Amino acid sequence: MVNSNFQFSYMLLDRLRQDCEYYLGFGGRCARQLWAHDEQAQINKMRELYDLVPEKPQWLTREQIDAYAKQMGVK
C-alpha cells in the first residue's frame, strides 16, 4: 500500500517514467515531450523521487532509470 504522505511522489515518478517511454518511442526523442523539458533534468528528478520514497515501486527499478538515462544519452 502506498504511504499517503508519498502519494504525489509515486504519481510523479510514474508520470516521469511514462514520459521516458513516450520520448523513446512515439515522441521522436523530443525533449519538450518530457516533464522536465531536458533529458538530464528528467533523469535527475526520477532518481531523486526514487530515493525519496520509502517503498520502492514494483513498476520501476533503479536499473530501469539508469537504462532510460543510457538510452537518452545522459548520465
Tell me what each language-model feature is:
Residues 12, 46, 65-68:
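Generic structural signal of hydrophobic/aromatic residues within well-ordered alpha-helices
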Residues 1-33:
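N-terminal acidic leader/helix
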Residues 1-7, 57, 63, 67-75:
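Short intrinsically disordered terminal tails
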Residues 20-62:
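Acidic, low-complexity, intrinsically disordered interaction modules
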